[in-house]
Swiss-Prot record:
Role, per record: Allows the formation of correctly charged Asn-tRNA(Asn) or Gln-tRNA(Gln) through the transamidation of misacylated Asp-tRNA(Asn) or Glu-tRNA(Gln) in organisms which lack either or both of asparaginyl-tRNA or glutaminyl-tRNA synthetases. The reaction takes place in the presence of glutamine and ATP through an activated phospho-Asp-tRNA(Asn) or phospho-Glu-tRNA(Gln).
BP GO terms, sorted: glutaminyl-tRNAGln biosynthesis via transamidation; regulation of translational fidelity; translation
NCBIfam families recorded: gatC
Organism annotation: Rhodopseudomonas palustris (strain BisA53)
Entry protein name: Aspartyl/glutamyl-tRNA(Asn/Gln) amidotransferase subunit C
Length: 95
């Protein structure tokens, strides 16, 4: 698989990146090099290799899933123009 100049311009347009005509050949080469690397990865034999999420054997540190107000509700609503019982008061939008 290879990327042509039209595809480079289309990708740049979709990414909202301004690319000059002088930059297109360089970007085309870069994208083709990335795709070649990905193609090399697909050729690697991974039969019998266990899936892993990290190269280091460590357990995820988990915390208890508790509902908490953060103990800063007064600071949070202090900046509000109007509040009541730790809730923001906003003007009515729909009549």
């Amino acid at each position: 698989m290879s990327v042509d100049a039209t595809t480079v311009r289309r990708i740049a347009h979709l990414a909202r990146i301004a690319v000059t005509d002088d930059e297109v050949p360089h970007l085309q080469g870069e994208l083709n090099a990335m795709l070649a690397f990905v193609e090399q990865l697909s050729e690697v034999d991974v039969e019998g290799v266990e899936p892993m999420t990290s190269v280091t054997p460590m357990q995820m540190k988990k915390r208890a899933d508790l509902v908490d107000d953060g103990e800063i509700t007064d600071k949070v609503v202090a900046n509000a123009p109007a509040s009541e019982d730790h809730f923001f008061l906003v003007p009515k939008v729909v009549e």
